[in-house]
Swiss-Prot record:
Keywords tagged on the record: ATP-binding, Carbohydrate metabolism, Glycogen biosynthesis, Glycogen metabolism, Nucleotide-binding, Nucleotidyltransferase, Transferase
Protein name: Glucose-1-phosphate adenylyltransferase
Pathway, per record: Glycan biosynthesis; glycogen biosynthesis
Enzyme class: transferase
PROSITE patterns listed in its UniProt record: ADP_GLC_PYROPHOSPH_1 (PS00808), ADP_GLC_PYROPHOSPH_2 (PS00809), ADP_GLC_PYROPHOSPH_3 (PS00810)
Organism: Kocuria rhizophila (strain ATCC 9341 / DSM 348 / NBRC 103217 / DC2201)
InterPro entries reported for this sequence: ADP-Glc_PPase, ADP_Glu_pyroP_CS, GlgC_bac, GlmU/GlgC-like_hexapep, NTP_transferase_dom, Nucleotide-diphossugar_trans, Trimer_LpxA-like_sf
Free-text function comment from the UniProt entry: Involved in the biosynthesis of ADP-glucose, a building block required for the elongation reactions to produce glycogen. Catalyzes the reaction between ATP and alpha-D-glucose 1-phosphate (G1P) to produce pyrophosphate and ADP-Glc.
Molecular functions (GO terms): ATP binding; glucose-1-phosphate adenylyltransferase activity
Record flagged with keyword Membrane: no
């Protein structure tokens, strides 16, 4: 019987997330709250743990305090069995530079690979919403004999400038012939003229091949030290890279409706849209799949409660996620996500919005198509999200699609 391959997982969690500002003004992108009680990194870590990979290092850099705290409070594996989720900041082990890119982050952390001594290295991003069985991807990688495998997902052609693009051999659809980051155009898929194959930012490498590629990249002058922009093209040009088609991935408990759901939430619009996906009557991503759970830190708070207000009007929430500690006192909530300890007072209306922890909505206030970060207080009678010019004058962020975003701890003038 052959020895089972030893796997080390590396999670790239140092991203700044500029397109998610102001949500990333005070935290790293992987630490941005999602769906009430989660952080974005919980999806990557849950997928790895559910896949059976329990030796995980998380490389951090940008404003990592809340991320580090979340990891220490939530992701405690049994170290007696050799399992761990370890947060590793930039340490200047190979010079005086901080991490110069995703590939350089791994290169500077090569000691972690040496210490773990794996056969296979799985590298994943920390800021996507999805379920995935990485064990199947690793198995297909080993069977292929390739040195590098990248997970690919179909995306509409109009999104080509937003992703790393995978082009394959028509005679061998798994073999990558070209990998390029965010090109202006690319050829559509042979079986679908409206789609191309995008990189999911998830990779599997033979350990020795990855180490050699990182060392080669470090010696080059014309490099961004990026996994997608530099390392994957290195393997593609050598004919040593294959693609793993995400449509073939199947996790326990998935349905035809939510199978292969994957969302890059790197913009305010995509972040908002992903929340709206969760609250449809038939959600396209099912948080309630207990066969493949998404783990997180469970906040200590009493159950959510809806009660009548002083005028006798019932507190109502429909088509919404209502987290522990939420109190709706005669208010109206529709098509929204309410994080822990949110309060909605009587005669207030909250529609199509994402409210983070401890947001307070005063009596008679109206909130529509908004993302309100932690601790935002909306005074009684205030309207947010219906008057673009007024919200801009308040210093709020308003997107082209009309989303209004209030940063953490924002206070409205009464």
């Amino acid at each position: 019987m052959s020895r089972q391959k030893k796997v080390l997982a590396i999670v790239l969690a140092g991203g700044e997330g500029k397109r998610l500002m102001p949500l990333t003004e005070d935290r790293a992108k992987p630490a941005v709250p999602f769906a009430g009680g989660y952080r974005l990194i919980d999806f990557a870590l849950s997928n790895l743990v559910n896949s059976g990979y329990l030796q995980i290092v998380v490389l951090t850099q940008y404003k990592s305090h809340s991320l580090d705290r979340h990891l220490s409070e939530t992701w405690r594996l049994s170290t007696q069995l050799g399992n761990y989720v370890t947060s590793v900041p930039a340490q200047q082990r190979r010079g005086k530079d901080w991490f110069l890119g995703s590939a350089n982050a791994i290169y500077q952390s090569m000691n972690l690979i040496d210490d773990a001594d794996p056969d296979i290295v799985v590298v994943v991003g920390a800021d996507h919403v999805y379920r995935m069985d990485f064990a199947d991807m690793v198995e297909k990688h080993i069977e292929s004999g390739a040195k590098a495998t990248v997970a690919g997902v179909r995306q509409p052609m109009e999104m080509v400038k937003s992703f790393g693009v995978i082009e394959t051999d028509p005679q061998d659809p798994a073999k990558i012939t070209r990998f390029v980051e965010k090109p202006d155009t690319t050829a559509p898929l042979p079986d679908d003229p409206h789609s191309f194959l995008a990189s999911m930012g998830n990779y599997v490498f033979d350990r020795d091949a990855l180490v050699e590629a990182l060392r080669t990249d470090n010696e080059k002058a014309d490099t961004d030290h990026d996994m997608g922009g530099d390392i994957m093209p290195y393997f593609a040009e050598r004919g040593e890279a294959v693609v793993y088609d995400f449509t073939h991935n199947d996790v326990p408990g998935s349905t035809d409706r939510d199978r292969q759901y994957w969302r890059d939430v790197g913009t305010l619009e995509s972040y908002f849209d992903s929340h709206m996906d969760l609250i449809r009557p038939l959600p396209v991503f099912n948080l309630y799949n207990y066969d493949w759970p998404i783990y997180t830190h469970q906040i200590m708070a009493p159950p959510a409660r809806t009660v009548r207000g002083p005028n006798g009007q019932a507190g109502v929430a429909f088509d919404s996620i209502v987290s522990p500690g939420v109190l709706i006192t005669g208010g109206h909530v529709g098509s929204s996500v309410l994080s822990p300890k949110v309060k909605v007072e009587h005669d207030a209306r909250v529609t199509e919005s994402v409210l983070m922890q401890n947001v307070q909505i005063g009596a008679g206030a109206t909130v529509h198509r908004c993302i309100l970060d932690k601790n935002v207080v909306v005074p009684p009678g205030t309207t947010v999200g219906l008057d673009r010019e007024q919200d801009l004058a308040r210093g709020l962020t308003v997107t082209e699609s009309g989303l209004t975003i209030a940063p953490k701890n924002y206070r409205f003038e009464r």
